[in-house]
Amino acid sequence: IRDRRLKGRQNLFILSVSKASNWIQEGGRSVYRIAVLAEQEAERQRYAEQITRFCESKGLFPQVVQYDDQERFFEAAQKDAPTNAVIALSGVAGLNAAEHLRSLCPVCRMIWCSDLDFSLHAFRLRADYFLLKPVSEEAFQLGLFTWLA
């Protein structure tokens, strides 16, 4: 069952919580393959560190891969689809990336961070969480909680 509520709270939008499988069974254990796509190295690193800390606190040990360009990200996604992805690109580039990711990986869990309010597009694309930049650590962590729902 999908809960398709749109709730605004400062720069935070809860879009969709789905029960789609967001893990892959490898060798008898669950593996999260999480892709982080962002233009700025500091931003990619910050999201990757927050994801790793959050998952480790839950007893999960994800494979987090960072990408700085969409072409490499989508080539990798076609070969080995991520279970989860964070898209943090500015403007229409973020919208295009979110649309392309959804077409390639229909069940991939997605957190989308943008400087423009694409919350309705994020809802249409079944993003789990949409955040307007600047994104606080607390707001991002709430997005990560939706991945465990």
Task: Spell out what each predicted region is.
Residues T83-L148:
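CheY-like receiver
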Residues A38:
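Conserved acidic carboxylate
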Residues Y67-N84:
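Acidic, metal-coordinating helix/loop segments flanking the phosphotransfer/catalytic sites
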Residues E41-V65:
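Two-component/phosphorelay signaling modules centered on CheY-like receiver
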Residues I1-A35, Q45-A48:
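Non-catalytic signal-transmission and effector/linker regions of two-component phosphorelay proteins
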